[in-house]
Curated annotation (Swiss-Prot):
GO biological process: potassium ion transmembrane transport; potassium ion transport; regulation of membrane potential
Domain PAS: 18-90
Source organism per UniProt: Rattus norvegicus (Rat)
Gene name of the encoded protein: Kcnh3
Location in or out of the cell: Cell membrane
GO cellular component: monoatomic ion channel complex; plasma membrane
UniProt-recorded name of the protein: Voltage-gated inwardly rectifying potassium channel KCNH3
């Protein structure tokens, strides 16, 4: 398995630090969120606190960290206020008070509130520790329970206040002195810290940076990699020179001293000594995959692993010889121990084994090194055969055979007294070291091949034996040589398979797991390179892959267990997930139920900074934290901190329900989790229904944090849409580009009906509500359901006639006060700014009076009324309620602006429509003078529809309360002001019964298309449509046409309607019929 780099991602180890540092007396603590002012909810609760108070973790979470649920009648009110003040001011506080367990038993508690800051220096958490000091208080007698809190007033006696206060003060002093005396054996330095007021360092709630000394080397850093390269070269040098110097040495006497060492030998020994020093300052990877930076742990780990081997390999034989210390050949053989350093190179070289060229190079180097060792041994065997031969001149060894072929035979000479020889052939291998004594006869063996020829011949034999069976030119003759040749051939067969057969099945089986790791790593790197993944995301991907590989070693357990039978697979799953199945939540489950649940459990892994669950995600599993710590966030606020043994998720929903997460869950450290899939959980509970109620009840108490609170989407209830008076709720969405989300569909051109009914039609109640600007509408109901249409509008299932449709949003531009008002009425509906033909506007047309329009059309798509989009099912959540409140507020502001604009418009019209005296009124054809004061009255009403303009035409002969003169002979009747202001049409038809027409001046509309009466029969002809449209002068209508409709004469009685000054609509006067309304004059205006 390749050496891992270790997990170097920065982690938030706050929870682990608290658990290890605050043990013993400080293990009973809770953590409160200091960012939620006023409540300071508990985000973590230790097991010791639960054991002390009797409350479970689920009962303590999200309560106030002041732990007011532990208060009782004897709890001091003053201490309560001081605790609250310390929390509000983010200050440290310590006090003694009486608290009560869940069972009701009181106990004395030493409470300590410690604020904890984050990386920004802000107080993020409160550490509230609780220490039970009841035993200390009980030593003073039973009256000590009554000295504080409510008992102080309950049992106090008059005149004893000073005595009780002194006694309490003395006991407090004794208690603190006893505490200091107990701490004295721990060391004087701690006492000095207490005297000078130095406080213990508290951990901060932040991502812990990698803190290491500058003298600590990272095992995978560039500096350490460079140093390892030098050590690799030195080790290879030792692997080559040590066997050669031991086997090819020509020293014959044990007392002979070695020659001076070379510079390379001295440099290698210095490097080995320095490597020992650096190994004491180099990080390592622990069994859990974490990188250890502590110097003490590093030293302990090195001493127990490679220290002894490195010390033996670094014995300075050459340095001792350099300092004139006599080192013999026997001691020099200990240098062969340095070859064991090659074992240390294997893990370091294994990280490069994923590259084929590197693997081939390393294998060839190993093969050549092995051949060098075999050659050295083969040379040593041949020389020993010559020295130990019984004859004076042995001739059966491979060295004698080589000497005869090279014509450099061996010969014997007598040893001289000074140890020299008379031949002087120092270049031969037998004479280079001074020769050797033959059989102890005083003769010395000299001659033979040179040392270079002998080594090359040995290396040739070694390679031929390792790669094949040899060629026979260099063969084994003696028994010793034959035995070594056999061993060499066996080693050669194995090495041949390893080196030259690495693509075969044997090599693949040997490196199957390694190849799988490298192939997946290579695929991952190729994917990153092809898709140009950014560097931070690339690092996260590699970290996650390496961390998960370290956990499961690349084994796909799901695929592996699929081939096993269900019975065996269930037993294996119960063994793997026994930590989760031993929770109290599953105590009542039968063995069969546990086996079914174990098959639904899946392992999961989360790295630091990774989000396990995002807010709004559909919850699909329950998660049990096996190791590590996580935090629950919502809008950057920490809601809970989860550690080992915590269960997160939601309450058991129905199968059809989808639960959305109400917060984010992020890993602080490397976390190993077990997730229970909700789908598998439902299937298991369906098989064992007797366990389902117990599991549902127990799950509420076991959840450390409920992620599904308020996140269940309810089913649709369409029965709420059946009422006639039910209005659909609308939601105004704010678009960033400023475009309207919904528009109003116009009425089709071939429809006889329109949103504004003709005078002959009877308005329905729903249409009247839509037409009145100040209608009183019921409060819209949330959660309306319907079928969505393609236009983004939900059609109610109860039918189109059941619900009137309104605008999606109403927006009014502000009206400036310093410019003349536009007296032409406009329909302000929030979409009037669009002037293209694709924008839908209101269509005001007067339909044909008659029985065919006696009833108003139902509000729907065909009638052209406004469409109300239905709110989707998620409108019941909190976000939708906030948006709806905002939309209602904005709509109210726009309605107020519209009311102010209408009042200004009404005042301006009242100033224009004042009573006029007798005067000449111009004809429609434009002949004759016209008073300037009448120009404003002659302007027709214009309604902007985006397509064509419409003008209002009064009937001929109608007068305005007798103020206008009667028509003279030969002249057309004068034009009257056709519009006063009256009550809204919500109490009656939209327009009184009159013969006025809405006629279009557009060229595209044929003449008379919008008229209800025939063409005028008087000699005076109206101006052409183009002139009328340009000048804005309405066409005249004859008296005959006015009376041909069968309308009663003006002045007939009618019912009066209530006046609404805030709701103004345009109506026609002067042509009252029997069924029309008799309008009353307003005092002071003549209208």
């Amino acid at each position: 398995m390749p050496a891992m780099r270790g997990l170097l991602a920065p982690q938030n180890t706050f929870l682990d630090t608290i658990a290890t540092r605050f043990d013993g007396t400080h293990s009973n603590f809770v953590l409160g969120n200091a960012q939620v002012a006023g409540l300071f909810p508990v985000v973590y609760c230790s097991d010791g606190f639960c054991d002390l108070t009797g409350f479970s973790r689920a009962e303590v979470m999200q309560r106030g960290c002041a732990c007011s649920f532990l208060y009782g009648p004897d709890t001091s009110e003053l201490v309560r206020q001081q605790i609250r003040k310390a929390l509000d001011e983010h200050k440290e506080f310590k006090a003694e008070l009486i608290l009560y367990r869940k069972s009701g038993l009181p106990f004395w508690c030493l409470l300590d509130v410690i604020p904890i800051k984050n990386e920004k220096g802000e107080v993020a958490l409160f550490l509230v520790s609780h220490k039970d000091i009841s035993e200390t208080k009980n030593r003073g007698g039973p009256d000590n329970w009554k000295e504080r809190g409510g008992g102080r007033r309950r049992y106090g006696r008059a005149g004893s206040k000073g005595f009780n206060a002194n006694r309490r003060r003395s006991r407090a002093v004794l208690y603190h002195l006893s505490g200091h005396l107990q701490k004295q054996p721990k060391g004087k330095h701690k006492l000095n810290k207490g005297v000078f007021g130095e406080k213990p360092n508290l951990p901060e709630y932040k991502v812990a940076a990698i803190r290491k000394s500058p003298f600590i080397l990272l095992h995978c850093g560039a500096l350490r990699a460079t140093w390892d390269g030098f050590i690799l070269l030195a080790t290879l040098y030792v692997a080559v020179t040590v066997p050669y110097s031991v086997c090819v040495s020509t020293a014959r006497e044990p007392s002979a001293a070695r020659g001076p060492p070379s510079v390379c030998d001295l440099a290698v020994e210095v490097l080995f000594i320095l490597d020992i020093v650096l190994n004491f300052r180099t990080t390592f990877v622990s069994k859990s995959g974490q990188v250890v930076f502590a110097p003490k742990s590093i030293c302990l780990h090195y001493v127990t692993t490679w220290f002894l081997l490195d010390v033996i390999a670094a014995l300075p034989f050459d340095l001792l010889h350099a300092f004139k210390v006599n080192v013999y050949v026997g001691a020099h053989l200990l240098k062969t121990v340095r070859l064991l350093r090659l074992l240390r190179l294997l893990p370091r070289l294994d990280r490069y084994s994923q590259y084929s060229a590197v693997v081939l190079t390393l294998l060839m180097a190993v093969f050549a090194l092995l051949a060098h060792w075999v050659a050295c041994v083969w040379f040593y065997i041949g020389q020993q055969e010559i020295e130990n031969s019984e004859s004076e001149l042995p001739e059966i060894g491979w060295l004698q055979e080589l000497a005869r072929r090279l014509e450099t035979p061996y010969y014997l000479v007598s040893r001289s007294p000074d140890g020299g020889n008379s031949s002087g052939q120092s270049e031969n291998c037998s004479s280079s070291g001074g020769g050797s004594e033959a059989n102890g006869t005083g003769l010395e063996l000299l001659g033979g091949p040179s040392l270079r020829s002998a080594y090359i011949t040995s290396l040739y034999f070694a390679l031929s034996s390792l790669t094949s069976v040899g060629f026979g030119n260099v063969s084994a003759n003696t028994d010793t040589e034959k035995i070594f040749s056999i061993c060499t051939m066996l080693i050669g067969a194995l090495m041949h398979a390893v080196v030259f057969g690495n693509v075969t099945a044997i090599i693949q089986r040997m490196y199957a797991r390694r190849f799988l790791y490298h192939s997946r790593t290579r695929d991952l790197r190729d994917y990153i390179r092809i898709h140009r993944i950014p560097k931070p995301l690339k690092q996260r991907m590699l970290e996650y892959f390496q961390a998960t590989w370290a956990v499961n070693n690349g084994i796909d357990t799901t695929e592996l267990l699929q081939s096993l039978p269900d019975e065996l697979r269930a037993d294996i799953a119960m063994h793997l997930h026994k930590e989760v199945l031993q929770l109290p939540l599953f105590e009542a489950a039968s063995r069969g139920c546990l086996r079914a649940l174990s098959l639904a459990l899946r392992p999961a892994f989360c790295t630091p900074g990774e989000y396990l669950i995002h807010q709004g995600d559909a919850l699909q599993a329950l998660y049990f934290v096996c190791s590590g710590s996580m935090e629950v966030l919502k809008g950057g606020t920490v809601l809970a901190i989860l550690g080992k043994g915590d269960l997160i998720g939601c309450e058991l929903p129905q199968r059809e329900q989808v639960v959305k997460a109400n917060a984010d869950v992020k890993g602080l450290t490397y976390c190993v989790l077990q997730c229970l899939q909700l789908a598998g959980l439902h299937e298991s509970l369906a098989l064992y229904p007797e366990f389902a109620p117990r599991f549902s009840r127990g799950l509420r108490g076991e959840l450390s944090y409920n992620l599904g609170a308020g996140g269940v989407s309810a089913e649709v209830d369409t029965s709420s849409l059946s009422g006639d008076n039910t209005l659909m709720s609308t939601l105004e969405e704010k678009e960033t580009d400023g475009e309207q989300g919904h528009t109003i569909s116009p009425a089709p051109a071939d429809e006889p009906s329109s949103p504004l009914l003709s005078p002959g039609c009877t308005s329905s109640s729903s249409a009247a509500k839509l037409l009145s600007p100040r209608r009183t509408a019921p409060r819209p109901r949330l959660g309306g359901r319907g079928r969505p249409s393609r236009a983004g509008v939900l059609k109610p299932e109860a039918g189109p006639s059941a619900h009137p449709r309104t605008l999606d949003g109403l927006q009014l531009p502000p009206m400036p006060w310093n410019v003349p008002p536009d007296l032409s009425p406009r329909v302000v509906d929030g979409i009037e700014d669009g002037c293209g033909s694709d924008q839908h506007k209101f269509s005001f047309r007067v339909g044909q009076s008659g029985p065919e329009c006696s009833s108003s059309p139902s509000p729907g798509t065909e009638s052209g009324l406004l469409t109300v989009p239905l709110v989707p099912s998620e409108a019941r959540n909190t976000d939708t309620l906030d948006k709806l409140r905002q939309a209602v507020t904005e709509l109210s502001e726009q309605v107020l602006q519209m009311r102010e604009g209408l009042q200004s418009l009404r005042q301006a019209v009242q100033l224009i429509l004042v009573p006029q005296g007798e005067g000449q009124c111009p004809r429609v054809s434009g002949e004759g003078p016209c008073p300037a004061t009448a120009s404003g009255l002659l302007q027709p009403l214009r309604v902007d529809t985006g397509a064509s303009s419409y003008c209002l035409q009064p009937p001929a002969g109608s007068v305005l309360s007798g103020t206008w003169p009667h028509p003279r002979p030969g002249h057309p009747p004068p034009l009257m002001a056709p519009w006063p202001w009256g009550p809204p049409a919500s109490q009656s038809s939209p327009w009184p019964r009159a013969t006025a027409l809405w006629t279009s001046t557009s060229d595209s509309e044929p003449p008379g298309s919008g008229d209800l009466c025939s063409e005028p029969s008087t000699p005076a002809s109206p101006p052409p449509p183009e002139e009328g449209a340009r000048t804005g002068t309405p066409a005249p209508v004859s008296q005959a046409e006015a009376t041909s409709t069968g309308e009663p004469p003006p002045g007939s009685g009618g019912r009066a309607l209530p006046w609404d000054p805030h709701s103004l609509e345009m109506v026609l006067i002067g042509c009252h019929g029997p069924g029309s309304v008799q309008w009353t004059q307003e005092e002071g205006t003549g209208v």
